[in-house]
Swiss-Prot record:
InterPro entries: Aminoacid_DH-like_N_sf, GDH_C, NAD(P)-bd_dom_sf, NAD-GDH_cat, NAD_Glu_DH_ACT2, NAD_Glu_DH_ACT3, NAD_Glu_DH_bac, NAD_Glu_DH_HM1. The active site is at K845. Catalyzes the reversible conversion of L-glutamate to 2-oxoglutarate. GO terms for molecular function: glutamate dehydrogenase (NAD+) activity; L-aspartate:2-oxoglutarate aminotransferase activity. Belongs to the Glu/Leu/Phe/Val dehydrogenases family. Keywords: NAD, Oxidoreductase. The keyword Amino-acid biosynthesis does not apply. Activity is inhibited by unphosphorylated GarA. PANTHER family: NAD-SPECIFIC GLUTAMATE DEHYDROGENASE. This is NAD-specific glutamate dehydrogenase. Interacts with (unphosphorylated) GarA. It catalyses: L-glutamate + NAD(+) + H2O = 2-oxoglutarate + NH4(+) + NADH + H(+). The lineage of its organism: Bacteria, Bacillati, Actinomycetota, Actinomycetes, Mycobacteriales.
C-alpha cells in the first residue's frame, strides 16, 4: 500500500482494520511466513502444525494497528520498541513489538535477551518490508519485500507473543535492556564493513611490520591469523584503539566501532612485551547473535615510545571452532612443533597425538605452547589404559575464569558424572558459575571444557587485582584425583566392593556391574548391591525373597523384594504389603538378568507400620517381626495367603502367616454359617484384640500339636481355654464378645485338623487346611446340624462336607455360590438324607468353590478347558483335605489307622465316600486317584461311577428308578405307560443321563415340548414311535442338543428354537397343545422364550418329567428369592398353575418342597426328588459295598486282581435289578400310604410330633405340616400329601436305622442272615462266609432290615406298635422279623407285586397282609417273653403255622367260611392266583394260629384239635363280625385308636380264654360242636346273659365304640379262666 504523505488524517489504513478479513493477503503472508516458534528442537511436523494456526491467531487488527503506530516514525539508525503487558488495552499482551532496520542478528539477539531474562515466548513474527521514509523518519510507503535489490530500506517489523506467565518485573527488564541490545545490533550492522577493513589493514601492517611497530618473533603468524579471522572465522562485534599506561588500557572514543563505539574508561592490559597478540574472553556474556561470551583479540603496537593495543571484540564462528588445527595460523606452527618433538617416541604415534590435539577447543590452543600441547596429548593417549580423569588447568590472566580441560574414558562419561565435575570445579575454585562444552566422539575418550567464572574483585579502573588462582601442578593433581574418584563408575565401585567382600566372584561382579540399570545404580550403593547379588544368586525360577534393612526409630524400614523369573506390577505388590498393616512411603522397581539368563526383578519399598501398630520394644523382637513379615509376604506372593486385614495379625499379635491362615479359615467358616458380621468387621475385631487372638491360637495348638503320649497337652489346653474365657469375659462390647466367643467355640468344637501335617503329598503341604468339626457344639450354625462336618480352606478353594452319621454318603458339588455354598450344601444334604433312607449310609453332601477361576481369553473352547482344569485341581485339593483328617483301614487286620500327625478328639471314623454331583459328574476317576494316592482303604469304591464301576448313564439307573415312580402314579389313574400313549413335557435334553434315559423308557411317550438351558423343543402332535426312534438317535449322538433333532420328523407347527431368540413363533397347534389361552396374550403370534417355557410348565399334559438342573416350580406362598435359584426366576411357575397330572422328578430340586405339597393338594401326583431319583445313590451304594467286599477278597488272594474288573462288570444287570427292586418297594409303599393317608392322619400327626420332639426333625425345614394345618386337613378329610409321606417315610427309616445300629440286633444271626441277599448271585454263591465279615455288615443288615420293615409293614408300623403296646421301636423291629418269618409275609408280598394286578386290588391285598403283621406283632409282644427272642419264636411258631395254614378251610365255619370264600373268589375273579387269594383272605384268621399253637402247647393238646375248636367257637359267638366292626371304628386321635385296640384285644383274649374253657370240659374224641355244647351247658347262666346282650346289640344295628365295648365285656364274662398263660 502507499501512504499519501500529504494526507491530513493521522489514522492510516492499518489502523482501520476491524476484522481479520480486512487484512490484505500480502500483509498476512508476510507475517505468517516469518513465524518462528519457541521450540527449535521440535519436529518439522510440529512446527508445521503450529505455523498453520498460531500466527494467524496472533494476526489481529489490534496487533497490526499497534505495530503500525509504533513504526509510523523511526529516525535512521534507531529502533522502535513497545512492550505490552497482559492487561494492556491493546488486547494482545503480553507481547513486545520492534521496528528496526533489517539485520542478521536482530532476531537472535532478541531471543538471547529473552532467554537470559527467563522470559518464555510463544511465537515471533518478523516480516521484512520495503519501507520509504521521509528524512525525518516519517513513514511514507510500506510494501512487500521485493526480490533482489530495492531502493527502499528493508525494515524488520517484529512481533513477539510472550508467555502469559511473564511477570511485570521481567517485562520491565525487557523494556530497559532491549533498546540497548538493538542499539548494539544497529552499531554492529552499521560498522560491519569498517570493522573488517580495520582488521584487514592491521593484518597488513603486522605482516609488513610497518614502521617497526609490530616487532615479534611470531609476527608473521599473527598477521596470517588476523587475516584468517577476517576470513569469516570471527564475527566482529567491535573495535577500539587503546593506549597503554600503567598496566591499563584507555580507549580512544573516536576510534570505537560496533559495540565499542563511544566506549571510554580503563581496562586491564592484555598484551605484554613478549606477546604481539593475546586472546582473552570477556567477563560478561553478549546479547548479540547466540549470546556467548565474546573474545577480545589484542594486538600490541609501539607508537612513538608508547604502547597501543588494538582490541577486536567478537565471536568465533562455528567453522572456526571446528577448523583443522593445521590450518589455523599460529596454532598450526605449535602443533607441528609438538608433532616433531614426538617423532622420537614410537609409543605415541603422531597421528594419534594429532587426533587428541584436534579435540582441544580452539581458543585454548592459542594459549598453549608446543611442549605443553605435546605433554597434554601424550597424557590423553595414555588415558585409555589408566581409566581415570585427566585435568588441565589454565587461569585467565585477568583472573576472570579458570579454563578446565577434562579428558576421561568415553565409557565413563555420563551426565551425572559431568554434573559432579561441575560441582567439584566450582567448589574448588570458588567459582560463581560455570559453562561447559562436551565432546564425545568415536575416540576412546570424552572431552569436557569447563569455564569456571570467578567472582569479581575490586572495581574496574581502580587497579584492583584478583587473588591468584591456584593452578599449580599439586593442586591440579589433587583436583584431578577428585574428578577421577567422581568419574569412577558405579561398576568400578561394585567390582572393588566385591573384591573386598570376597562373597561375589569377579566374573559375577563384572556381569552385574554391566547388568544393573542406571536407576538401580543411582538408588543402591555398590556395598548394598553386593548383598543384593548374594540374594539374587540364591533365587530360582518363580522364587521370591524379601530382605529388610535400614529401620529407623520411627519404624520406617527399607524392604527389598526380589522376584526370580517373574515380574509384577506395583499395583499387584502394594495391596500385599498394605494388607500386612504397613504404609508404603516410597517404591522403586528395578530389573536385572543373572549370568545364567534368569531375569530378576527387584522392588525397593520404604514402609512404616500403621500408626495403630506398636513397634516391638527390643531389637530381637523387631528382627523376629521382620522375619515373620517377610515370610508372610512371601506366602502371599506365592498365593498361599489371601490379601486381607487378617495379615495385620503378623505384626499386631506376633503370629506366623500359618496361624493367620487358621484364623482366616475359621472366619470364612463363620461367614458360611450365616454369621451376621462381615469379614471386614471380624478382621477389625481381631486386630483390636491381639492378646485374645494369641490366646485362641495357643488354645488351638494346645489341643492339636502332635505330642508323645503322657505329655501335659491336656493340661495346657485347659489353661489356654481358661485364658481365652478370661479375655472374652473382660470384654464390654457385645458384638466383640460374640465374635471372639464364636472363634473360641469353633476351636473347642474342632475334632481334627491337618494343620500340623507335614507329609509330602498331603493337602496341607499344598496349603489346604482341613478342620473337622462337631457341628452340634457350634451355636452359630443354622439347623439342621450335621453329626460331622469338615471345612476345607485354602486361598484357591473352599469347601464343606456335611455328614449326618458315621456311615454317610452323598455327592460333591462344584458350587458357584462362593458366598454361601454351605447354605446350598445344607439344603442339598437335607434332601440327600431323605434320599439315603433306602441305602446303607445316611445323608452326606459336600461342595466346593473355585476361588481363582482363570481369566477369560476370548476363546470359548480354551476358556472352558482352563475352567475345567482349575475345577479339577480344586476338586483334588478338596478331597485331599478330607482325606488328610480321615482314618484308614488296614485290609489285612481290619484295624483302623488314624491319619498321621493328626490329633483325634473323636473316635474311629474311616468311612468316607463321595459321589458325583453338579459340576463333578465325570470326576469319579479323579477322586479315586486321589484316594489311591493316600492308600485309602476304599480304593476306587471311594467314588462310585468311575471307569471301573457302574456307569449310571449307561445303566440308565437313575432314570429307571424315577420311572418306577412315574409308572406307579399312572397305574393309580388307570394308565399303563408301557402300553398306552401319553403326553409329556420335559426339562432337559437327550444328551443328559436322567432326561435322555428317561425319555426312552416307554415307546408310548408323546413328547410335545421340552427345554434346556439352550433350546426349546416343540412337537405338538408327535408320532410316539417315530419320535422315540429320533430321541434314541440323539441319545446315542455324543454331546447332542435339541438342535440336532431332525426337523422333518417334527409335526406341523413345531420346531426347535434357541432360548437366545427375542421371540419364538407360536403356531395354532402349539397354542392348542400347550393350552395357551388367547385371552392371556391376546392371541399373539409369538412369545418370548421365558414366557413360552412358563407355558410349557403349565401345559395340560399327562406327565411333566424333570431331568434338568434348576428349580422351576414353587408354591404360590414362596417368592423367587425364597427359592434361591436366580437363573430360573424368569421361567418359574407356581405349583397350583401346573396342569400336568404327574410330575416325575429325575433331577434334583426341580420343585420346591412346598411346591410339591401345593401341587399334590391341587390334585397332582408327585413324590419327592429324593424318592424318585434315589436309584442313583442306591446303585452307588451297592457299588461301594461290593467293591469293599471284592477288594478284601483281592487282598486275601481269594480273587485275582485282574479278575476284579470283569467280576464287577458281570454283575451290572443284577445290581440294577436289586436297586430297582428297592424303588418298586418304596413306590408301592407310597401308593398304599397315599391310599390310606386320610384315615391314618391322626397316626401320622402323632408320628410327626414324635419325630419333632425325639428326633429333632424340623417341620419347616422338611416341609411337614404344622399342627394347625393337620387340624385343617382333618376337618377336610384330607391326609398327608405324597411328598409329605415320602419325607415322613425317610425319617422313619433313618430313625429306625440309627436305633437298630445302636443295638446288638445286626450281629444276631436271625437278622444278619439276610446280609447275603444284598449282593448279586455271583458273590453270594462264591463268597458267603466273606460276605458275613464285610466291613459294613452291620450297616447293610440294618438297612435291609429297616427297608423291609417299612416297605412291607408301612410307615407307621413301628411307631404304632411302640405306642400301642408301650414298647420301644426296637421291640417293634423284633416282632416284625418274627412275624415275617412265621407267616411268610415277605413271600406273600412279593407274590402280590409279581401278579401285576390293578393298583386298587394290589393295595387291598397289601393292606390285608399288613393287618396280619400288626395283629401278630401285638400278640407276640403281649403273650411272649420280652425282649422277644426272635429266633426262638420263629422256631416255635413258623413250622406249625406253615403246617396248619393249608387246613384253614377245614376249620372255618359258617359266616367266617363264607366271608373267606367270597373274598377269595372276588380276588381270584380279578386275576389274583387262587392260592394267593385264599392265603390273603384267610390272613386275619391265620393270625389266630398264634393263639391256637400257644393253647396247644399250654394244654398239651394237638394243635389241629385246638384249631377246630377255636374256629368253631368263633363261629358260634360271631366274633368275626364284631372284629370287623371294631376295624371300622374311627381313629380321630390316639385315644380312639387305643380304644379300638383294647376292644379287639379283649375279644381275642376272651376267645382265647373261652377256647381254654371249652377244651377243658370236652372229652377226647368229641367234635368241636359237642365240646362247645357241653361248655354252654355247664355255663348256661353266664352264656345266656351274654347272648341276650349280644343279640340286643346285633338287633340294634349300632356298632359304635360303646356297644362294641359292651359286647367285648359280655364275651369276657363267659369265661372261667384267664387264658393268659404263656407256654415255655
Amino acid at each position: 500500500m502507499t501512504i499519501d504523505p500529504g494526507a491530513k488524517q493521522d489514522v492510516e489504513a492499518w489502523t482501520t482494520f476491524t476484522a481479520s478479513a480486512d487484512i490484505p493477503d500480502w500483509i498476512s503472508k508476510a507475517y505468517i511466513d516469518s513465524y518462528r516458534g519457541p521450540r527449535d528442537d521440535s519436529s518439522e511436523a510440529t512446527k508445521a502444525a503450529e505455523a498453520s494456526w498460531l500466527p494467524a491467531s496472533l494476526l489481529t487488527p489490534a496487533m497490526l494497528g499497534a505495530h503500525y503506530r509504533l513504526g509510523r516514525h523511526r529516525a535512521a539508525g534507531e529502533s522502535c520498541v513497545a512492550v505490552y503487558r497482559a492487561d494492556d488495552p491493546a488486547g494482545f499482551g503480553p507481547a513486545l513489538q520492534v521496528v528496526a532496520e533489517h539485520g542478521g542478528m536482530l532476531m537472535d539477539s532478541v531471543t538471547v535477551l529473552l532467554h537470559r531474562l527467563g522470559i518464555a515466548y510463544a511465537a515471533i513474527l518478523t516480516p521484512v518490508f520495503d519501507v520509504h521514509r521521509s528524512p525525518t523518519g516519517e513513514l511514507l510507503r510500506i510494501e512487500p519485500k521485493a526480490e533482489g535489490t530495492s531502493p527502499h530500506l528493508g525494515e524488520a517489523w517484529m512481533h513477539v507473543a510472550l508467555s502469559p506467565a511473564v511477570d511485570h518485573k521481567g517485562l520491565a527488564e525487557v523494556e530497559r535492556l532491549l533498546p540497548k541490545v538493538l542499539a548494539d545490533v544497529q552499531r554492529v550492522a552499521t560498522d560491519a564493513t569498517a570493522l573488517i577493513a580495520t582488521l584487514s589493514e592491521l593484518a597488513g601492517e603486522v605482516e609488513s611490520n610497518a614502521g617497526g611497530r609490530f616487532s615479534a618473533p611470531d609476527r608473521q603468524d599473527v598477521g596470517e591469523l588476523l587475516r584468517w579471522l577476517g576470513d569469516g572465522n570471527f564475527l566482529l562485534l567491535g573495535y577500539q584503539r587503546c593506549r597503554v599506561a600503567d598496566g591499563m588500557v584507555y580507549g580512544e572514543g573516536s576510534s570505537g566501532m560496533g559495540v565499542l563505539r563511544g566506549r571510554t574508561g580503563s581496562r586491564p592490559r592484555l598484551t605484554d612485551d613478549d606477546k604481539l597478540l593475546v586472546l582473552a574472553q570477556a567477563r560478561v556474556g553478549s546479547y548479540l547473535r547466540y549470546g556467548a561470551y565474546p573474545y577480545a583479540i589484542a594486538v600490541r603496537e609501539y607508537v612513538d615510545g608508547s604502547v597501543v593495543e588494538h582490541r577486536f571484540v567478537g565471536l568465533f564462528s562455528v567453522a572456526a571452532m571446528n577448523a583443522d588445527v593445521l590450518e589455523i595460523p599460529t596454532i598450526s606452527r605449535r602443533v607441528r612443533e609438538a608433532l616433531a618433538m614426538a617423532e622420537s617416541d614410537p609409543s605415541h604415534p603422531g597421528q594419534l597425538l594429532l587426533d587428541v590435539i584436534q579435540t582441544v577447543p580452539r581458543p585454548e590452543l592459542f594459549t598453549l605452547s608446543a611442549q605443553r600441547l605435546l605433554t597434554m596429548a601424550r597424557a590423553v593417549v595414555d588415558l585409555g589404559s589408566q581409566r581415570q580423569a585427566l585435568l588441565f588447568l589454565r587461569a585467565d590472566r585477568l583472573q576472570y575464569f579458570v579454563s578446565c580441560l577434562v579428558y576421561m574414558p568415553r565409557d565413563r562419561y555420563t551426565t551425572a558424572v559431568r554434573m559432579q565435575f561441575e560441582d567439584i570445579l566450582v567448589r574448588e575454585f570458588g567459582g560463581t558459575r560455570l559453562e561447559f562444552t562436551a565432546r564425545v566422539s568415536e575416540s576412546p575418550w570424552a572431552l569436557m571444557h569447563f569455564m569456571v567464572r570467578l567472582p569479581e574483585v575490586g572495581v574496574a579502573g581502580e587497579g584492583a587485582a584478583a587473588p591468584p588462582v591456584d593452578v599449580s601442578e599439586a593442586n591440579r593433581i589433587r583436583i584431578q584425583g577428585l574428578l577421577t574418584e567422581a568419574a569412577r563408575t558405579w561398576a568400578d565401585r561394585l567390582i572393588g566392593a566385591a573384591a573386598a567382600a570376597g562373597s561375589v566372584g569377579q566374573a559375577d561382579a563384572m556381569h552385574y556391574a554391566a547388568a544393573f540399570s542406571e536407576a538401580y545404580k543411582q538408588a543402591v550403593t555398590p556395598a548394598d548391591a553386593i548383598g543384593d547379588i548374594a540374594v539374587i544368586t540364591e533365587l530360582t525360577d518363580d522364587s521370591v525373597k524379601l530382605v529388610f534393612s535400614e529401620r529407623d526409630e520411627q519404624g520406617v524400614a527399607q524392604l527389598t523384594w526380589f522376584l526370580g523369573g517373574r515380574t509384577a506390577s506395583l499395583s499387584q505388590l502394594l495391596p500385599m504389603l498394605q494388607s500386612m498393616g504397613v504404609v508404603v512411603l516410597e517404591e522403586r522397581p528395578f530389573s536385572v538378568t543373572r549370568p545364567d539368563g534368569l531375569p530378576v526383578w527387584i522392588y525397593q519399598f520404604k514402609i512404616s507400620p500403621h500408626p495403630t501398630i506398636p513397634l516391638a520394644p527390643t531389637v530381637a523382637e523387631r528382627a523376629a517381626t521382620a522375619h515373620r513379615f517377610a515370610e508372610a509376604v512371601t506366602a502371599i506372593w506365592h498365593g498361599r495367603v489371601e490379601i486381607d486385614r487378617f495379615n495385620e495379625l503378623v505384626m499386631r499379635a506376633g503370629l506366623t502367616w500359618q496361624q493367620v491362615v487358621l484364623l482366616r479359615a475359621y472366619a470364612k467358616y463363620l461367614r458360611q454359617a450365616g454369621f451376621p458380621y462381615s469379614q471386614s468387621y471380624i478382621e477389625s475385631v481381631l486386630n483390636e484384640h491381639p492378646a485374645t487372638v494369641r490366646s485362641l491360637v495357643d488354645l488351638f495348638e494346645a489341643l492339636f500339636v502332635p505330642v508323645p503320649s503322657g505329655s501335659a497337652s491336656n493340661r495346657d489346653a485347659q489353661a489356654a481355654a481358661a485364658a481365652v474365657a478370661a479375655d472374652i469375659d473382660a470384654l464390654v462390647s457385645l458384638d466383640t464378645d460374640r465374635i471372639l466367643r464364636a472363634f473360641a467355640s469353633l476351636v473347642q468344637a474342632t475334632l481334627r485338623t491337618n494343620y500340623f501335617v507335614t507329609r509330602q503329598g498331603s493337602a496341607r503341604c499344598r496349603d489346604v487346611l482341613a478342620l473337622k468339626l462337631n457341628a452340634q457344639l457350634i451355636d452359630e450354625l443354622p439347623l439342621p446340624r450335621p453329626r460331622y462336618e469338615i471345612f476345607v480352606y485354602s486361598p484357591r478353594v473352599e469347601g464343606v462336607h456335611l455328614r449326618f452319621g458315621p456311615v454317610a454318603r452323598g455327592g460333591l458339588r462344584w458350587s458357584d455360590r462362593r458366598d454361601d455354598f454351605r447354605t446350598e450344601i445344607l439344603g442339598l444334604v437335607k434332601a440327600q438324607a431323605v434320599k439315603n433312607a433306602v441305602i446303607v449310609p445316611v445323608g452326606a453332601k459336600g461342595g466346593f468353590v473355585v476361588k481363582r477361576p482363570p481369566l477369560p481369553t476370548g476363546d470359548p473352547a480354551a476358556d472352558r478347558d482352563a475352567t475345567r482344569a482349575e475345577g479339577v485341581a480344586c476338586y483334588q485339593l478338596f478331597i485331599s483335605g478330607l482325606l488328610d483328617v480321615t482314618d484308614n483301614v488296614d485290609h489285612a487286620t481290619a484295624s483302623v489307622n488314624p491319619p498321621p500327625e493328626v490329633v483325634r478328639r473323636d473316635g474311629d471314623d474311616a468311612y468316607l465316600v463321595v459321589a458325583a454331583d453338579k459340576g463333578t459328574a465325570t470326576f469319579s476317576d479323579i477322586a479315586n486317584d486321589v484316594a489311591k494316592s493316600y492308600g485309602f482303604w476304599l480304593g476306587d469304591a471311594f467314588a462310585s461311577g468311575g471307569s471301573v464301576g457302574y456307569d449310571h448313564k449307561a445303566m440308565g439307573i437313575t432314570a429307571r428308578g424315577a420311572w418306577e415312580a412315574v409308572k406307579r402314579h399312572f397305574r393309580e389313574i388307570g394308565i399303563d405307560t408301557q402300553t398306552q400313549d401319553f403326553t409329556v413335557v420335559g426339562i432337559g435334553d437327550m444328551s443328559g443321563d436322567v432326561f435322555g434315559n428317561g425319555m426312552l423308557l416307554s415307546k408310548h411317550i408323546r413328547l410335545i415340548a421340552a427345554f434346556d438351558h439352550r433350546h426349546i423343543f416343540l412337537d405338538p402332535n408327535p408320532d410316539a414311535a417315530v419320535s422315540w426312534a429320533e430321541r434314541r438317535r440323539m441319545f446315542e449322538l455324543p454331546r447332542s442338543s435339541w438342535s440336532d433333532y431332525d426337523r422333518s420328523l417334527i409335526s406341523e407347527g413345531g420346531g426347535v428354537y434357541s432360548r437366545e431368540q427375542k421371540a419364538i413363533p407360536l403356531s395354532a397347534q402349539v397354542r392348542a397343545v400347550l393350552g395357551i389361552d388367547g385371552s392371556v396374550d391376546g392371541g399373539a403370534a409369538e412369545m418370548a422364550p421365558p414366557n413360552l417355557i412358563r407355558a410349557i410348565l403349565r401345559a395340560p399334559v399327562d406327565l411333566l418329567f424333570n431331568g434338568g438342573i434348576g428349580t422351576y416350580i414353587k408354591a404360590e406362598s414362596e417368592s423367587d428369592a425364597d427359592v434361591g435359584d436366580r437363573a430360573n426366576d424368569p421361567v418359574r411357575v407356581n405349583a397350583n398353575q401346573v396342569r400336568a397330572k404327574v410330575i416325575g422328578e429325575g433331577g434334583n430340586l426341580g420343585v420346591t418342597a412346598l411346591g410339591r405339597v401345593e401341587f399334590d393338594l391341587s390334585g397332582g401326583r408327585i413324590n419327592t426328588d429324593a424318592l424318585d431319583n434315589s436309584a442313583g445313590v442306591d446303585c452307588s451304594d451297592h457299588e461301594v459295598n461290593i467293591k469293599i467286599l471284592i477288594d478284601s477278597l483281592v487282598s486275601a488272594g481269594t480273587v485275582k486282581a485282574d479278575e476284579r474288573t470283569q467280576l464287577l462288570e458281570s454283575m451290572t444287570d443284577e445290581v440294577a435289578q436289586l436297586v430297582l427292586a428297592d424303588n418298586e418297594d418304596q413306590n408301592d409303599l407310597m401308593g398304599t400310604s397315599r391310599a390310606n393317608a386320610a384315615s391314618l392322619l391322626p397316626v401320622h400327626a402323632m408320628q410327626i410330633k414324635y419325630l419333632v420332639a425325639e428326633r429333632g426333625v424340623n417341620r419347616e425345614l422338611e416341609a411337614l405340616p404344622s399342627e394347625k394345618e393337620i387340624a385343617r386337613r382333618s376337618e377336610a378329610g384330607i391326609g398327608l400329601t405324597s411328598p409329605e409321606l415320602a419325607t415322613l417315610m425317610a425319617h422313619v427309616k433313618l430313625g429306625l436305622k440309627e436305633e437298630v445300629l445302636a443295638t446288638e440286633l445286626p450281629d444276631q444271626d436271625v437278622f444278619a442272615s439276610r446280609l447275603p441277599r444284598y449282593f448279586p448271585t455271583a458273590l453270594r454263591e462264591r463268597f458267603t462266609p466273606e460276605i458275613r465279615s464285610h466291613q459294613l455288615r452291620r450297616e447293610i443288615v440294618t438297612t435291609m432290615l429297616i427297608n423291609d420293615l417299612v416297605d412291607t409293614a408301612g410307615i407307621t408300623y413301628a411307631f404304632r406298635i411302640a405306642e400301642d403296646v408301650g414298647v420301644t421301636p426296637i421291640d417293634a423291629v423284633r416282632t416284625y422279623v418274627a412275624t415275617d418269618a412265621i407267616f411268610g409275609v415277605g413271600h406273600i408280598w412279593r407274590r402280590i407285586r409279581a401278579a401285576n394286578l390293578p393298583i386298587a386290588l394290589s393295595d387291598r391285598l397289601t393292606l390285608d397282609t399288613r393287618r396280619l403283621i400288626d395283629r401278630a406283632g401285638r400278640w407276640l409282644l403281649n403273650y411272649r417273653p420280652q425282649p422277644l427272642a426272635v429266633g426262638a419264636e420263629i422256631n416255635r411258631f413258623a413250622a406249625m403255622v406253615k403246617a396248619l395254614t393249608p387246613r384253614m378251610s377245614e376249620w372255618l365255619r359258617g359266616d367266617d367260611k363264607a366271608i373267606v370264600e367270597k373274598t377269595a373268589a372276588e380276588f381270584a375273579s380279578q386275576g389274583v392266583p387262587e392260592d394267593l387269594a385264599y392265603r390273603v383272605s384267610t390272613g386275619l384268621y391265620r393270625y389266630s394260629l398264634l393263639d391256637i399253637i400257644d393253647i396247644a402247647d399250654i394244654a398239651d393238646i394237638d394243635a389241629a384239635e385246638v384249631a377246630d375248636t377255636y374256629f368253631a367257637l368263633m363261629d358260634r359267638l360271631g366274633t368275626d363280625g364284631l372284629l370287623t366292626a371294631v376295624s371300622q371304628l374311627p381313629r380321630h386321635d390316639r385315644w380312639h385308636s387305643l380304644a379300638r385296640l383294647a376292644i379287639r384285644d379283649d375279644i381275642y383274649g376272651a376267645l382265647r380264654s373261652l377256647c381254654f374253657d371249652v377244651l377243658a370240659v370236652g372229652e377226647p374224641g368229641e367234635s368241636s360242636e359237642q365240646k362247645i355244647a357241653e361248655w354252654e351247658h355247664l355255663s348256661a347262666s353266664r352264656v345266656a346273659r351274654a347272648r341276650r346282650t349280644l343279640d340286643d346289640i346285633r338287633a340294634s344295628g349300632q356298632k359304635d365304640l360303646a356297644t362294641l365295648s359292651v359286647a367285648a365285656r359280655q364275651i369276657r364274662r363267659m369265661t372261667r379262666t384267664s387264658g393268659r398263660g404263656i407256654s415255655g
